A protein has these predicted regions:
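Carbohydrate-interacting regions of secretory-pathway proteins
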Residues: 25-248
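N-terminal secretory signal peptides and thylakoid transit peptides that target proteins
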Residues: 3-14
Length: 248
């Protein structure tokens, strides 16, 4: 038999095998993470669709450090994209600063838990909450701060209240969101807008003056600053799928 037909059959077989392999390869490379969130394995600060950047990813805390220090305080850990602590420790702050931004994350606390996420924080004071505004994280049903709506879950801590009945019970995951565009800021919890305000306006100025924050002249004044995660309260805290994007 001539060698030419054999060569033609071999070439056809190789071509068919290559075409069959393409869908499988495409499926592996194009897999998307659920809910549009950045996959947990993505490196911190790697931009994803829509300009989102993951702040907690894989087993890395590369985007974070301790308040007024370059190292990560003991007591914080991140495993498979979940940041956690089980005891009181020093606060974390983001290495980057943000002015106008949108921040999303999921969180849960142990029974009686109390924590917070700060934004536009600076480091001239002993604590970040003396300069940065706080989105309160709380087990409303069991923590003392749950007795006041001004210090309940989702509140603009000490200034603007959050309604009752939105936060989930202890040890269940909540979804939170902050939108900050210039003076306008919104706090969201589990798909519901809980509070919004205009920073530096007359109402805001009056509320700050009537609060404990009046003792710190720089409180809430920065247009740009660090994000922070409160660690100084006892108890369990877990955060996952935390991501941020700049707004224009």
């Amino acid at each position: 038999m001539s060698a030419e037909p054999s060569r033609r059959r071999l070439a056809a077989a190789l071509l068919a095998a290559g075409l069959l392999a393409l869908p499988a390869c495409a499926g592996r490379q194009g897999a998307a993470s659920p809910h549009g969130m950045a996959p947990n394995g993505m490196a911190p600060n790697a931009a994803s669709a829509g300009g989102w950047r993951p702040l907690v990813a894989g087993n890395s805390l590369a985007g974070w450090r301790g308040y007024q220090t370059d190292s990560v305080p003991g007591g914080w850990a991140v495993v498979d994209g979940v940041l956690s602590k089980t005891r009181g420790t020093r606060d974390l702050v983001s290495r980057d600063e943000y002015g106008d931004f949108e921040l999303e994350w999921e969180w849960k606390l142990g029974t009686g838990g109390n924590s917070g996420v700060f934004y536009r924080g600076t480091e001239e004071y002993d604590h970040i909450y003396w300069s940065g505004t706080e989105y309160q994280l709380l087990d409303d049903a069991n923590a003392p701060d749950g007795r006041s709506r001004l210090t309940a879950a989702g509140a603009v801590y000490g200034l603007y209240p959050a309604p009752a009945g939105v936060v989930k019970p202890a040890n269940e995951w909540n979804t939170s969101r902050i939108v900050a565009r210039g003076a306008h800021v919104e706090h969201w919890l589990n798909g519901r807008k809980l509070a919004e305000y205009e920073a530096w306006g007359p109402d805001w100025e009056a509320k700050v003056k009537a609060s404990k924050f009046a003792a710190w002249p720089h409180y809430g004044r920065a247009r740009r600053g660090h994000l922070g995660i409160q660690g100084d309260h006892r108890g369990d805290l877990a955060i996952r799928n935390m991501r941020v994007r700049g707004l224009q």
